């Protein structure tokens, strides 16, 4: 039996060494140490031997079993080490290679314009207000003197939202930031109720939405609207404030501006503001006018006492003019090559 045991050890060591993966190794383990393995069969045969021989051979078989288990464990460790070395080699980093520079982010060009507009108007005493992008039909249209049959109320021009507010008013994505002017003015009036009320001076930048999409229009765009209401604010103030804003924004004193008569439901009189552009061409850059008496009433103000002006400008258009960009869609495509020009 001694020769058989030595052969089992030799066979087990050879079989384990030939196993190139854990699955094969486990199969070889079963051949020697499993329920029907060679060593297990020898242990079962001990019962047929006399007590003295059984004791001697049992000790010998257990010794051989320990040798086989040691060979098995050694091969397991060798396979694990080989797997780890292969993984480390695959994930190795060559520390002599040049490093990758960390790229720096920058403000989007429209956000640069947004911040610049806030800075310019802030320097002459205008507050900055923000409001909800989901507005009520009343706040977006009715409070601003838009009649019920106004084309802007149609689903071809406005994104309506399912559901209504707590007062059963229709909900929509605001088409301009003018609703925030109404909200701000009402809060201003309530704040100074029974007191001497200072003028209302505020700009409202923010995202707005309209059903439109081409090279010069987007269904989502950014707008800034301004409002100045007091007891002696005139159209001349509007011309002075907006002309001064354009000169500071474009950093030019020779900018030519004209106010062209127009119509907007929320202002009377109304004007479109054009800026000289190119070779004798004029480009519309803003809508404006004196706040309509009905809008003043909806703000909680007496139109016989208070007067003021409002204007609204697209931030994308201002950005396009400032940087010479000819396609509005570039702002929304996320092309890093385009955005890096403003880093």
From Swiss-Prot:
Top-level taxon of origin: Bacteria
Binding-site residues for Mg(2+), renumbered to this chain: 268
Family, per entry: Belongs to the class-II aminoacyl-tRNA synthetase family. Phe-tRNA synthetase alpha subunit type 1 subfamily.
Keyword Lyase applies: no
Catalytic reaction(s) noted: tRNA(Phe) + L-phenylalanine + ATP = L-phenylalanyl-tRNA(Phe) + AMP + diphosphate + H(+)
GO molecular function terms attached to this record: ATP binding; magnesium ion binding; phenylalanine-tRNA ligase activity; tRNA binding
GO biological process: phenylalanyl-tRNA aminoacylation
GO cellular component, one term: cytoplasm
Record's protein name: Phenylalanine--tRNA ligase alpha subunit
Subunit text: Tetramer of two alpha and two beta subunits.
């Amino acid at each position: 039996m001694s020769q058989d045991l030595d052969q089992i050890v030799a066979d087990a060591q050879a079989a384990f060494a030939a196993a190139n993966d854990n699955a094969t190794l486990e199969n070889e383990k079963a051949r020697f140490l499993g329920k029907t393995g060679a060593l297990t069969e020898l242990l079962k045969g001990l019962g047929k031997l006399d007590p003295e021989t059984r004791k001697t051979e049992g000790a010998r078989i257990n010794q051989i079993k320990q040798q086989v288990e040691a060979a098995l464990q050694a091969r397991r460790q060798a396979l694990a080490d080989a797997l780890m070395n292969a993984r480390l080699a695959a994930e190795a980093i060559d520390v002599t290679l040049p490093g990758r520079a960390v790229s720096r982010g920058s403000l989007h060009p429209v956000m640069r314009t947004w911040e610049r507009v806030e800075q310019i108007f802030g320097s002459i005493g205008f507050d900055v207000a923000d409001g909800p992008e989901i507005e009520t039909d009343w706040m977006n249209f009715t409070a601003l003197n838009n009649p019920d049959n106004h084309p802007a109320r149609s689903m071809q021009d406005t994104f309506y939202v399912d559901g209504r507010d707590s007062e059963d008013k229709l909900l929509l994505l605001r088409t301009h930031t003018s609703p925030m002017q109404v909200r701000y003015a009402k809060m201003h009036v309530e704040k100074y109720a029974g007191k001497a009320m200072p003028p209302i001076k505020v700009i409202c930048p923010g995202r707005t939405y309209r059903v439109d999409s081409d090279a010069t229009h987007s269904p989502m765009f950014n707008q800034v609207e301004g409002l100045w209401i007091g007891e002696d604010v005139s159209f001349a103030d509007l011309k002075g404030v907006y002309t001064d804003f354009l000169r500071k924004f474009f950093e030019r004193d020779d900018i030519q501006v004209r106010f062209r008569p127009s119509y907007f439901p929320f202002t009377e009189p109304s004007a479109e503001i054009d800026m000289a552009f190119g070779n004798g061409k004029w480009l519309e850059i803003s809508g404006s006018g004196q706040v309509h008496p009905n809008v003043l009433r909806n703000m909680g103000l007496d139109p016989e006492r208070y007067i003021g002006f409002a204007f609204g400008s697209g931030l994308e258009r201002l950005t396009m003019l400032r940087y010479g960009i000819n396609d509005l869609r570039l702002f929304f495509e996320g092309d890093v090559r385009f955005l890096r020009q403003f880093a």
